[in-house]
């Protein structure tokens, strides 16, 4: 895989509000650090630094504080990751100016609809996270975020019996609408986080 014009691999994580993007980051980043990788994290939001502040606290002692940044898009979340990713690209440049040793930057989108996708100048590899609680029918709605991402993550599998979602149906529908891999996760107990990690490493670091 050819990377963006920057000398660092970039992974975009998108998905609706409440799907578990921040929880997935929380699970992935310490594992990446344990494997000896230098990681930066960018959290996009419309008007606040809320997610970035949460991640700085969670990654204290794991990731240097200046490698966790918030980008306030001031507009629809997809604008900052697709139509005009300049603020995110500038933040990556800022990371690299102070930390040229960086191996990987993870970019979390603000919560958005099923149409959100990443500009290829921003993300070498993209994950799209949906939650079981959003409804069993989400995969078959064929949103570009679901269909076009490199890896679809179906999160919060522990909630399936409580919301009447059939995971087998979701898996079947997801495989019907997309050619890429699908992983079912529960970030609370880190079910299949290792599988997500393997896809990220194989898809962007060792491609």
Curated annotation (Swiss-Prot):
GO CC, alphabetical: cytoplasm
Going by the UniProt record, its keywords in alphabetical order are: Chaperone, Cytoplasm, GTP-binding, Nickel insertion, Nucleotide-binding, Plasmid
Indicate where this protein resides in the cell: Cytoplasm
Cross-referenced Gene3D superfamilies: P-loop containing nucleotide triphosphate hydrolases
Where primarily located?
cytoplasm
Write down the Pfam families for this protein, in alphabetical order: cobW
Task: Name the Gene Ontology biological process terms.
Answer: urea catabolic process
| UniProt: GTP binding residues | 15-22
* Role description: Facilitates the functional incorporation of the urease nickel metallocenter. This process requires GTP hydrolysis, probably effectuated by UreG.
- Give the family this protein belongs to, as stated in its UniProt record: Belongs to the SIMIBI class G3E GTPase family. UreG subfamily.
What subunit structure does UniProt give? Answer: Homodimer. UreD, UreF and UreG form a complex that acts as a GTP-hydrolysis-dependent molecular chaperone, activating the urease apoprotein by helping to assemble the nickel containing metallocenter of UreC. The UreE protein probably delivers the nickel.
Family matches, as HAMAP family: UreG
Protein name, per record: Urease accessory protein UreG
The record lists the lineage as:
Archaea, Methanobacteriati, Methanobacteriota, Stenosarchaea group, Halobacteria
Recorded name of the encoding gene: ureG
């Amino acid at each position: 895989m050819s990377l963006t014009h920057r000398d660092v691999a970039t992974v975009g994580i998108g998905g609706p509000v409440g799907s578990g993007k921040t929880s997935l980051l929380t699970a992935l980043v310490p594992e990446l650090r344990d494997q000896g990788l230098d990681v930066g994290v960018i959290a996009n939001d419309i008007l606040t630094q809320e997610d970035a502040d949460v991640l700085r606290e969670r990654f204290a002692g794991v990731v240097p504080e200046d490698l966790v940044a918030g980008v306030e898009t001031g507009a629809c979340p997809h604008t900052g990751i697709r139509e005009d990713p300049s603020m995110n690209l500038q933040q990556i440049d800022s990371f690299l100016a102070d930390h040229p040793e960086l191996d990987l930057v993870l970019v979390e989108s603000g919560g958005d609809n099923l149409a959100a996708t990443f500009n290829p100048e921003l993300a070498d590899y993209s994950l799209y996270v949906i939650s079981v609680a959003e409804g069993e029918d989400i995969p078959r709605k064929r949103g570009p975020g679901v269909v076009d991402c490199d890896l679809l993550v179906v999160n919060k599998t522990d909630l399936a019996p409580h919301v009447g979602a059939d995971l087998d149906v979701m898996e079947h529908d997801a495989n019907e609408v997309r050619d890429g891999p699908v992983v079912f996760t529960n970030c609370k107990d880190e079910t299949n986080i290792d599988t997500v990690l393997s896809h990220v490493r194989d898809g962007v670091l060792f491609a």
